[in-house]
C-alpha cells in the first residue's frame, strides 16, 4: 500500500541522515559534533511527532477511502444481484428460465403418465360394470325362466286336480241323476191308479231276506257314496289315472321345524343339494329357506328359485345330497 512505501522511504532517509556524520566525521570534528548533538536531537523529536501525525492522518484518509470503496462495491454488488434476480424472475414469468422449464417438463411427463393410467383404469371400470350388468341380466332371465317353470307346474297340478274333481263330480252327478229319475218314476207309478204294477201280486220270498227300513233319500245318498268309491278304486276305466296318481305320490316329503324330510333323509339350510327334473340336466344349489309348503334355494349363478313340497311328493322334482 502507499503508506508502507512512504514509511520505508522516510526510514531510509533518516538512516542516511544518521549515518552521514559518522562517515564524514574525523577525530578533530568529534568535539564540535558533541556540542551540536543536543540541538539536533530536539529537532529530530519534533520531526518524529510531525511524521507520526502526518502518517496517522494519511492512514485515516486511506481507511475512509477504503470504507467508501467497500460501501460502493457493496451497493454495486447488491444492485447487480437485484438486477439478476429481476431478470430471472422475468424469465420465469415468461416461461424461459431453465430452473422453471426442467421441473415443468417433469410435471408434464408425470401428468401424461397419470392421464394414461386413469384412462386405462376408466376402461377397466367400464368393462367391469358392463360385465356385472350382463351378469345381472342373465341372472334375472334365469330367475324368470325358473319362476315360469314353477308357475307352469303349479298351474298344471292345480288344473289336473280340478279336472280330477270335475270327473268325480260328473260321475257322481250321473249316478245321482239316474237314481233320482228312477225314484221319480217309481213315485209316479205309485200315484197312477192304472199302473200295471199295482195289479201285480206281491212277490213271495223264501229263505233269508233283508228288509230295508231306510228312506229313499238315505238310500240314494248311500248309493252315491258307494258309486264314488267304486269310481275312484274299482272300475277299470279309472285305473290308469289311479296308477298315475300313485306314481306321483310315491315320494315322501314334509317340512318339520325348519327342516325338510324327503325319502328318509333330512335337509337343512346351507346344505348343497342336486336338483333333478325330468328331461333336464341336474343342477346344484344351496338351500336358503324351508317353509311349510315350499323350499327356497340359490343356484350357482346367484339366482333364487323355489320348489313346492307338493312337487317333490308328486315326483316332478327330486333332490339329493352332494
Curated annotation (Swiss-Prot):
<comment type="function">
    <text>Involved in the histone deacetylase (HDAC1)-dependent transcriptional repression activity.</text>
</comment>
<feature type="coiled-coil region">
    <location>
        <begin position="50"/>
        <end position="82"/>
    </location>
</feature>
<keyword id="KW-0804">Transcription</keyword>
<dbReference type="Pfam" id="PF08598">
    <property type="entry name" value="Sds3"/>
</dbReference>
<feature type="coiled-coil region">
    <location>
        <begin position="147"/>
        <end position="178"/>
    </location>
</feature>
<feature type="region of interest" description="Disordered">
    <location>
        <begin position="1"/>
        <end position="56"/>
    </location>
</feature>
<feature type="compositionally biased region" description="Acidic residues">
    <location>
        <begin position="17"/>
        <end position="51"/>
    </location>
</feature>
<keyword id="KW-0539">Nucleus</keyword>
<feature type="compositionally biased region" description="Basic and acidic residues">
    <location>
        <begin position="1"/>
        <end position="16"/>
    </location>
</feature>
<keyword id="KW-0678">Repressor</keyword>
<dbReference type="InterPro" id="IPR013907">
    <property type="entry name" value="Sds3"/>
</dbReference>
<keyword id="KW-0805">Transcription regulation</keyword>
<dbReference type="GO" id="GO:0005654">
    <property type="term" value="C:nucleoplasm"/>
</dbReference>
<protein>
    <recommendedName>
        <fullName>Breast cancer metastasis-suppressor 1-like protein</fullName>
    </recommendedName>
</protein>
<keyword id="KW-0175">Coiled coil</keyword>
<comment type="similarity">
    <text>Belongs to the BRMS1 family.</text>
</comment>
